[in-house]
Amino acid sequence: MPKAPKGKSVGQEKKVIHPYSRKAAQITRKAHKQEKKEELKNEKALRLNLIGEKLQWFQNHLDPKKVGYSKRDACELIERYLNRFSSELEQIELRNSFKDRQGRRHCSREAAIRQTLEREQRQYQAHGLEIPDILNADNLKTFREWDFDLKKLPNIKMRKVCASDAVPKKCKKKAVTTIDGDLGELELKDESSDTDEEMTAVA
């Protein structure tokens, strides 16, 4: 009877990879790359959801009679947006004020809301808060027709509006001129004081 051929058995386990081998390093890099890819994907989805929620709020609070918004109107709408959690914060404060409750309840939710509002308020006061471009009639019309589909977000034009946009241009120009004048006076004072110091040092 012929002998069975020697060789690897069908059920033999796979060869163990040495933890410090190049193959192990390659597998580790591939796993890290996949994890990073999933991380970025989740971050993008979360960011899109947050943008979608913001745009949905603005669409729900548009004045149906307006065909276009002025900068002042847009600023007033943003002020309402920044106060959108007021009633919820009041409810949290009311629940926490009960004497029979020990410790603060809903503290994580309250902290998240306040952190979000502080960040948005800083953006609005500084370089501007990004909102749908409701100042342009065509862009406003497109935004009104949006059906909350996140895939259609690229079709919605955005623009930044800051708190100073509520001030008329004439007032802003006057304020800028005054500030520039004050800065000029300060520079002249600094130069004169430097000259005096140099003369004193030489003497």
Curated annotation (Swiss-Prot):
Gene3D superfamilies registered for this protein in UniProt? Translation machinery-associated protein 16-like (1.20.1440.170)
Q: Report the locations given in the UniProt record.
A: Nucleus
- Report whether Methyltransferase shows up as a keyword of the record: no
Provide the positions where the record notes the PTM ADP-ribosylserine: 9
| GO MF entry, a single one | preribosome binding
The UniProt family comment states: Belongs to the TMA16 family.
* Functional note: Involved in the biogenesis of the 60S ribosomal subunit in the nucleus.
The protein depicted here goes by the name Translation machinery-associated protein 16
> According to the entry, what is the taxonomic lineage of the organism?
Eukaryota, Metazoa, Chordata, Craniata, Vertebrata
Name of encoding gene? TMA16
